[in-house]
Amino acid sequence: MSIKKRKPTINSQRQYSVDDKEDITTTDPERSLLEPLPNSGGRNNQGRMTMRYRGGGHKRRYRKIDFKRRDKDGIPATVKTIEYDPNRSARISLLAYADGEKRYIITPDGLEVGDTVMNGPQAQAEVGNCLPLTSIPLGTKVHCVEMTPEKGAQMVRAAGTHAQLTAREGDYATLELPSGETRLVPSKCRATVGTTSNVEHENVVLGKAGRKRWLGRRPRTRGVAMNPIDHPMGGGEGLKSGGHPRSREGVPAKGYKTRKRNKESNKYIIRRRTESKQGTGGQ
C-alpha cells in the first residue's frame, strides 16, 4: 500500500492524500457477517447529546470480527479475501476454516490471500497465528492482545500498530505498547503475531472538511468563540485568549493528569506512556 497525493488544482486538493487500496482484493463483504449499524448522532438512549460534533457521514454496516479465536484451536483456516472495513483503520481478512465456517479477523501486515493461519497453543509463532503469550517467543511483535483471558482482543488493534513481548515471569507477561507504556498482562491471554495492516494510515491527510463529514464528524466550535455560559473560555470584549486552556467541563487541557490515582489496574503498569508518544489531537 502507498499514499497518493493530488495535484493542487484547487485548494481542497492541495494537502489531500489517500491510500491506493492496492491490498484490497474485493469490495463485496460476506453477507452472513454483516450487521446493521444505526447512527446515533452522538445521542444516548434517552435522545440526549452525550458527544458533541458527531452526526451524518456515510451509512455503514458492521462487520463481525472474531476477536477471541478460541473455539477454533487446531483448525486451519485459509485467507480468502482482504477487505476494507469502514469501522476501523486496519484491513480485515475473511478466513475460511476447514470445518466450513467463515470469520473475519484484523489483517496483519504481510498476510496474503491463500495463506493458512492457525489458532491455539500448538500453532507456530508466525504472522496471523493467534497464540497464548506463554507460547510466543520473547521479542516477538504482536497485536490484538487480550487484557483478560477469554475476553477477546482489546489492545493494539489500530492500523500499523504492534506491541512487543519483552519478558515473562510467573503468571504475567510484560508488553511494551505502542503508546510507550510497559504493562503486565496475564500469560494466559492471547495475541496475534505480527503488526496490523495499513501501516501508511498515519500518513494520510484528509485535506478538506468534506472528508471529515464523510466520517461522521461535524465542525468543532472553539471555546473562545462561545459565550461564557457555554464554555469557561468564552466571553470577553473583542478577541480574547480565554485564559488557561480547559475543556467545557473546566478540566485543564495542558498536562493535567485525568487518570484516577487509585485505579485498580495501576498495579499492572510498570512504566507510564512516554510524553513523546502521547497523541497531539486528530487531523
From Swiss-Prot:
One CC-aspect GO term: large ribosomal subunit
Origin: domain of life: Bacteria
Disordered: annotated segments: 1-59, 222-283
Keyword terms of this UniProt record: Ribonucleoprotein, Ribosomal protein, RNA-binding, rRNA-binding
Protein's UniProt keywords contain rRNA-binding: yes
NCBIfam families linked to this entry: rplB_bact
Protein name: Large ribosomal subunit protein uL2
Source organism of this protein record: Salinibacter ruber (strain DSM 13855 / M31)
Lineage, highest ranks first: Bacteria, Pseudomonadati, Rhodothermota, Rhodothermia, Rhodothermales
